[in-house]
């Protein structure tokens, strides 16, 4: 078993099986592209359990991802994919960067979900880019762009319904995709409070990493509460 890649939140290892990786979730938490960074015991476990729950439920509803199975509280087995260097963001309500960028009032619901692409390049601070930029950079062609948007909106519909079952609002989220050995585009990376913005419908309390970004509460307590809500479904 060899370390293939290490990022801010995960380590990726090779396995004895071709085209299969083992992912280990770390206890590190970052914000602002790593400008703020801490180690919090139990964070990796929570994100792995939450992501595994979402990927398993999405699979039952027909949405394929790189996820194969949960190996332990902090580990997953996944299909090897070549990550497409885009963060695909879906916004249902105005919050975060779009409020600063375009002047929307925080919490305003969009008439329909908005899909945005961000170029995954730390040196450039992951800039927002258009479909034409995606093509000029050689990241994806028209067909792949359409497929990324199609899957992102399907995932959004599924997640919105799950959040609704917990009396929560899915404000926005970011996901990543990769291509398998056959060129199929698959959901990859994770879906967790690290990558979603989630509010309580009544109190507007955060159930996401904003509690860490804004120093408004305990990240571990918040993620634990969210996981407990998932388990109760």
Swiss-Prot record:
Belongs to the SAICAR synthetase family. The keyword Transferase does not apply. It catalyses: 5-amino-1-(5-phospho-D-ribosyl)imidazole-4-carboxylate + L-aspartate + ATP = (2S)-2-[5-amino-1-(5-phospho-beta-D-ribosyl)imidazole-4-carboxamido]succinate + ADP + phosphate + 2 H(+). Transmembrane segments: none annotated. It is an enzyme of class 6 (ligase). InterPro entries: SAICAR_synt/ADE2_N, SAICAR_synt_PurC, SAICAR_synth, SAICAR_synthetase, SAICAR_synthetase_CS. Pfam families: SAICAR_synt. This is Phosphoribosylaminoimidazole-succinocarboxamide synthase. Keywords: ATP-binding, Ligase, Nucleotide-binding, Purine biosynthesis. GO terms for molecular function: ATP binding; phosphoribosylaminoimidazolesuccinocarboxamide synthase activity. It comes from Macrococcus caseolyticus (strain JCSC5402) (Macrococcoides caseolyticum). The keyword Nucleotide-binding applies. PROSITE patterns: SAICAR_SYNTHETASE_1 (PS01057), SAICAR_SYNTHETASE_2 (PS01058). Its EC number is 6.3.2.6.
């Amino acid at each position: 078993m060899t370390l293939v890649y290490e990022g801010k939140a995960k380590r990726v290892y090779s396995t004895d099986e071709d085209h299969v990786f083992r992912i280990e979730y770390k206890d590190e938490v970052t914000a602002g592209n790593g400008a703020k960074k801490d180690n919090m015991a139990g964070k990796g476990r929570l994100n792995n359990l939450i992501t595994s729950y979402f990927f398993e439920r999405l699979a039952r509803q027909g949405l394929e991802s790189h996820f194969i199975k949960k190996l332990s509280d902090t580990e997953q087995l996944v299909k090897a994919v070549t990550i497409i260097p885009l963060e695909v963001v879906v916004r249902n309500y105005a919050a975060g960067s779009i409020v600063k960028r375009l002047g929307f009032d925080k919490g305003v619901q969009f008439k329909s979900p908005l899909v945005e692409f961000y170029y995954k390049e730390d040196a450039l601070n992951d800039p927002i880019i258009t479909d034409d930029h995606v093509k000029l950079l050689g990241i994806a062609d028209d067909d792949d762009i359409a497929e990324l948007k199609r899957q992102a909106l399907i995932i959004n519909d599924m997640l919105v319904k799950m959040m609704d079952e917990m009396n929560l609002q899915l404000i926005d989220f970011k996901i990543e995709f990769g291509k398998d050995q056959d060129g199929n585009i698959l959901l990859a990376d994770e879906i967790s409070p690290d990558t979603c913005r989630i509010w309580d419908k009544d109190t507007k309390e955060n159930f996401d990493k904003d509690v860490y970004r804004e120093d408004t509460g305990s990240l571990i307590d918040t993620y634990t509460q969210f996981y407990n809500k998932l388990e109760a479904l």
